[in-house]
Amino acid sequence: QNKPYEINISLFDALQGTTAGPDSWGVERFVCAHAIMLALEGIPGIYIHSLLGTRNDYERVENSGHYRAINRHQWDYDALVSELSREESSHSQVFARIKTLLEVRRQQAAFHPNATQFTLHLGDAIFGFWRQSMDRRQSIFCIGNVGNEPLPLALADINLIGTDDWVDLISGQHYHSREQVIEIAPYQVL
């Protein structure tokens, strides 16, 4: 009996659309998925092709005769350096943004692998959870719009402490009032 071993597609290409078909949110959707993964409890693992936003390698499938080769591209060093140096390249955009997310994670005590985590219930298209450092001195609310429409978010809905100033660790945006309602762009993570 045949059983599927794996999905034969690169993760980057798998996230280039929804059930409605391909769309223009591919890079944003891909980075959103990684931002959520990097903020979750535990020790994250990142496949090199996710770090680089590697697309399906159809030529490798054809040459090897193995479908699983589709997500096992072998980069030529000079070609990779060239792609990463072009700001408009999806590879460059993904690499820079995931590096930023890794740095944010590294700097925050609440992202310790064993730090507390609780899921927030904020609606169907908003994925959220709360992380708290092991010494309980830092709280981080990770909020991601996992849909392709902008969504309002009332800061009061995530139980922010009213006397604290809150900062989006990715954008640097400050929020001074828990009464604020902010708009989260499609696939944006705060």
Residue ranges and their predicted role:
Residues H176-L190:
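C-terminal beta-strand-rich structural cap/linker in extracellular carbohydrate-active enzymes
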